[in-house]
């Protein structure tokens, strides 16, 4: 049995979250494949630095300290050299951006460093808890994306032909959000795309299920920004989930469900600190019920425009 777990930045706020993650992995039957986002707030810091690289002098030092607070001993471990390599890569990208701000290759490498650091932190911590884990870079093992620079989705067909399955033995911690673009350079998915990375990997390895661990207990029927208190939807069909993700559901990336619907892999969305008997959302095959409204979505800042024109004959009158 293979379970793909995805832990986002909201589940990587401090070292206590790593303790909880290790408990989750130990309680999972069969093999666990882990996909991670950057630690909470890291991507935003890297993005700001990409806009003002000349003034990001303390960034590398601050990121080093932050990640070592999460996982002490990482720098001295057997993957410490990888940690140093990522930090040096950040410095290099900042220098390249300072010289040429429109260098999108350097910008993407800079932004992807958050996921690389996170994978190292989580993997090292799991090893200290007796879990045989290792970090994996998505583009290094053949995960291909449909685009260059920025890509909408993982290219499942190309990835299936190139994926190095041997690197996914044990308990791998895989970087989310990016992969190899069609031009051979690193490419990024949209923000929140680590969920899509997780479901794409599940499709490629024929996993039994995917669990997206969040700081919310599933998909809510109404966006919480509306200020209406609700409880999570217990079950959504693949089609329903895809429709909600395109409208107003911040929990789901629009491309998340598609790789699972194609092969029937179930998806669970769970709160990291709530047990399974609490609220959660399971996404699976569509169950048609024409009288059951499960959620309400709304696209903000959209206007309806109607244009009427006269025919050439009418205009000539």
PLM features: residue spans?
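Alpha-helix boundary/capping detector
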Residues: 152, 228, 267, 286-287
């Amino acid at each position: 049995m293979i379970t793909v777990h995805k832990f986002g930045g909201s589940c990587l706020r401090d070292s206590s979250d790593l303790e909880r993650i290790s408990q989750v992995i130990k309680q999972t039957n069969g093999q666990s494949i882990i996909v991670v986002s950057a630690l909470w707030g890291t991507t935003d810091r890297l993005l700001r630095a990409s806009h003002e690289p000349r003034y990001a002098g303390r960034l590398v030092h601050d990121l080093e300290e932050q990640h070592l607070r999460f996982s002490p001993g990482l720098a001295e471990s057997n993957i410490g050299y990888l940690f140093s390599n990522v930090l040096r890569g950040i410095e290099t990208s900042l220098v390249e951006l300072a010289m040429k701000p429109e260098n999108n290759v350097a910008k993407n490498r800079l932004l992807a460093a958050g996921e690389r650091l996170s994978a190292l932190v989580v993997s090292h911590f799991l090893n200290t808890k007796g879990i045989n884990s290792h970090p994996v870079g998505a583009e290094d093992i053949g995960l291909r994306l449909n685009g260059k620079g920025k890509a909408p989705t993982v290219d499942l067909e190309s990835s299936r032909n190139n994926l190095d399955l041997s690197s996914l033995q044990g308990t791998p911690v895989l970087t989310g959000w990016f992969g190899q673009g069609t031009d051979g350079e690193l490419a990024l998915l949209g923000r929140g795309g680590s969920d899509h990375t997780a479901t794409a990997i599940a499709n490629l390895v024929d996993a039994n299920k995917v669990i997206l661990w969040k700081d919310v207990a599933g998909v809510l029927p109404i966006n919480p920004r509306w200020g209406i208190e609700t409880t999570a939807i217990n079950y959504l069909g693949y089609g329903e989930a895809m429709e909600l993700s395109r409208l107003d559901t911040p929990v789901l990336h629009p491309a998340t469900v598609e790789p699972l619907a194609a092969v029937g892999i179930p998806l669970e969305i769970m709160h990291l600190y709530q047990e399974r008997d609490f609220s959660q959302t399971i996404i699976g095959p569509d169950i048609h019920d024409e009288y059951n409204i499960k959620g309400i979505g709304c696209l903000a800042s959209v206007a309806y425009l109607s244009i009427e024109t006269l025919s050439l004959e009418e205009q000539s009158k």
